[in-house]
UniProtKB/Swiss-Prot annotation:
It is found in: Mitochondrion inner membrane. Component of the ubiquinol-cytochrome c reductase complex (complex III or cytochrome b-c1 complex) that is part of the mitochondrial respiratory chain. The b-c1 complex mediates electron transfer from ubiquinol to cytochrome c. Contributes to the generation of a proton gradient across the mitochondrial membrane that is then used for ATP synthesis. The cytochrome bc1 complex contains 11 subunits: 3 respiratory subunits (MT-CYB, CYC1 and UQCRFS1), 2 core proteins (UQCRC1 and UQCRC2) and 6 low-molecular weight proteins (UQCRH/QCR6, UQCRB/QCR7, UQCRQ/QCR8, UQCR10/QCR9, UQCR11/QCR10 and a cleavage product of UQCRFS1). This cytochrome bc1 complex then forms a dimer. Binds 2 heme b groups non-covalently. Heme b b562 binds at H83, H182. Keywords: Electron transport, Heme, Iron, Membrane, Metal-binding, Mitochondrion, Mitochondrion inner membrane, Respiratory chain, Transmembrane, Transmembrane helix, Transport, Ubiquinone. Pfam families: Cytochrom_B_C (PF00032), Cytochrome_B (PF00033). The keyword rRNA processing does not apply. The keyword Heme applies. It is a multi-pass membrane protein. Its cofactor is heme b. This is Cytochrome b.
Length: 379
């Protein structure tokens, strides 16, 4: 009798994805973040579902409903803070996952990579809309500032912004539609994840050496299921430590003040995971230029397959590229720090230099260094 695992139409798909999947024998802990992102998405959808049962998307009651969740709902505080800090964990895993892809040349799987970049955009949009829902000061002003950026689009800008707002300012209509989109987008993300995996399993996983590993594959289960469980335990440990000991560490105190259109906070800034892009946006004095730089700072990821001029796929044996990669990482940390600082000297200058360095490393220095390394191979 044949195993149901290998014959049943539905179970067969699960089998080919998580059990009998041939995986390279040498993939490191950097390959754990895909499964961790899946876990983060599951946590966010579950906690979000329970929050949506008690939340009201009305400007008069939104802030009070979040307070009610934290004070009166059974373990509401836990659900709310798991959702808020779960978003931070989601982005930490996302950045590490993308960084792994850049370092080991995983972007040469074009379809998988491009779906991944689209996923990054959709997750960022979802997180932005979620930040607006508690209707605190930073929610309101963050929504006002970021949606207003679209007015920089020539000719249709102003109409587009008013269309998104559903009026002449961020108000009840905006909050309601943001809630609707914030609810539905995670399910679209889940569908995109399926497509992401579909394309990945067409080619098989990359590995740290960047070499073809068809001759040395091992089954996903039990080797990588056990390895993933370790990652899962560490992620849950980190998340619950944050939630139970310092739930407001990554939040903004201004968001504990109800939204007031008549009082602008002294420093409007997004959540920490958007600060690097926000710093790039602010480093350009022109509004349209800033918006284009903001979009391109993420969209540039799609150019990596075209900018790959090295004869080797991975950076494992390319010390010059490694050096530039870690300078790029340091530059992103600098941009994140600058994004949270007020717009004044010397932060403006540092932000502009860091922004120029970001684009220069990706568009110019990394490809040039790759060509130099190709020459060194002949010595």
């Amino acid at each position: 009798m044949t195993n149901i695992r290998k014959t049943h139409p539905l179970i067969k798909i699960v089998n080919h994805t998580f059990i009998d999947l041939p995986a390279p024998s040498n993939i490191s802990a950097w390959w754990n973040f895909g499964s961790l992102l899946g876990l983060c998405l599951a946590i966010q959808i579950l906690t979000g579902l329970f929050l949506a049962m008690h939340y009201t998307s009305d400007t008069m009651t939104a802030f009070s409903s979040v307070t009610h969740i934290c004070r009166d709902v059974n373990y509401g505080w836990l659900i709310r803070y798991m959702h808020a800090n779960g978003a931070s964990m989601f982005f930490i895993c996302l950045f590490l996952h993308v960084g792994r892809g850049l370092y080991y040349g995983s972007y040469t799987y074009f379809e998988t990579w491009n779906i991944g970049v689209i996923l990054l955009f959709v997750v960022m949009a979802t997180a932005f809309m979620g930040y607006v829902l508690p209707w605190g000061q930073m929610s309101f002003w963050g929504a006002t500032v970021i949606t207003n950026l679209l007015s920089a689009i020539p000719y249709i800008g102003t109409t587009l912004v008013e269309w998104i707002w559903g009026g002449f300012s961020v108000d009840k209509a905006t909050l309601t539609r943001f809630f609707a989109f914030h609810f539905v987008l995670p399910f679209i993300i889940a569908a995109l994840v399926m497509v992401h995996l579909l394309f990945l399993h067409e080619t098989g996983s990359n590995n740290p050496s960047g070499l073809i590993s068809d001759s040395d594959k091992i089954p996903f289960h039990p080797y990588y299921t056990i390895k993933d469980i370790l990652g899962v335990l560490l992620l849950i440990l980190a998340l619950m430590t944050l939630v139970l000991f310092s739930p407001d560490l990554l939040g903004d105190p201004d968001n504990y003040t109800p939204a007031n259109p008549l009082s602008t906070p002294p420093h409007i800034k997004p959540e920490w995971y958007f600060l690097f892009a926000y710093a790039i946006l602010r480093s350009i004095p022109n509004k349209l230029g800033g918006v284009l730089a903001l979009v391109f700072s993420i969209l540039i990821l799609m150019l990596f397959p075209l900018l790959h001029l090295s004869k080797q796929r991975s950076m494992m044996f390319r010390p010059l590229s490694q050096c530039m990669f870690w300078i790029l990482v340091a530059d992103l940390f600098t941009l994140t720090w600058i994004g949270g600082q007020p717009v004044e000297y010397p932060f403006i200058t540092i932000g502009q230099l860091a922004s120029v360095l970001y684009f220069t490393i990706i568009l110019l220095i990394l490809p040039t260094v790759s060509l130099i390394e190709n020459k060194l191979l002949k010595w």
